[in-house]
Amino acid sequence: MKQKYQYIKNTELDLKDKIFGINKPKNFSSNQVIQIIKKYYGLKKIGHAGTLDPLATGLLLVATNSKTKELNELILENKKYVAEIQFNYQTSTYDAEGEITNYTTRKIHEKTLKEELKFLNSTYWYQQPPVYSAVKIKGKKLYEYARANQEVSVPFKKVYINKVELISFDSISQKTFVSLDVSKGFYIRSFANDIGLRLNNYGYLLNLKRVEVGNYKLDQAYDFFDLVKQVN
């Protein structure tokens, strides 16, 4: 059973009527983060410009009170990420939370990976959201179908890759770090799965950090635990 914590304000910052970034920690949902901030800073309204999965970290762009009306535009901004992908394995959730569903011993070579990523720059990409996601089909969230072992047709979604670059690749562990600059609605988990398949292999997302949303950058964001202190 997960330990429940209380929080206290760490600062006397005024976060009312503001747009600001929070460095979301791992194992917190995006909604958990903003609801904690809302409660302990006495805010009337709060929202964010794009969900990060609980396992992801990085820039959660937040708007409060009167500024929440700007979220509809902020959500449309391009986003930049650093993703760590593990090849040779496929999982049910396309990330480290799921069960391993496929495995191969085939090795990916750095040159092949570089060529594939270069090919994907400035291209439209058709992807299916992960079955374990909050996307709604016929009024029901995809993860609800998955948990009930119910099959459902998941439509492909047209998204855009502005730029994708190889940061590093380890040929022994078959792990890679890539940077991605993508349009709204882009699922990095689906990308990890798809890039594995495109390379005649498998892949899943090990770690993800969002570093930019439009003109807002992670290095300008508040650390979550600088805003609130966790107490038993």
UniProtKB/Swiss-Prot annotation:
InterPro entries: PsdUridine_synth_cat_dom_sf (IPR020103), PsdUridine_synth_N (IPR002501), tRNA_psdUridine_synth_TruB (IPR014780). It catalyses: uridine(55) in tRNA = pseudouridine(55) in tRNA. Keywords: Isomerase, tRNA processing. Transmembrane segments: none annotated. One of its GO terms (biological process) is mRNA pseudouridine synthesis. It is an enzyme of class 5 (isomerase). The active site is at D53 (nucleophile). GO terms for molecular function: RNA binding; tRNA pseudouridine(55) synthase activity. Its EC number is 5.4.99.25. It comes from the Bacteria. Signal peptide: none annotated. Belongs to the pseudouridine synthase TruB family. Type 1 subfamily. Responsible for synthesis of pseudouridine from uracil-55 in the psi GC loop of transfer RNAs. This is tRNA pseudouridine synthase B. It comes from Malacoplasma penetrans (strain HF-2).
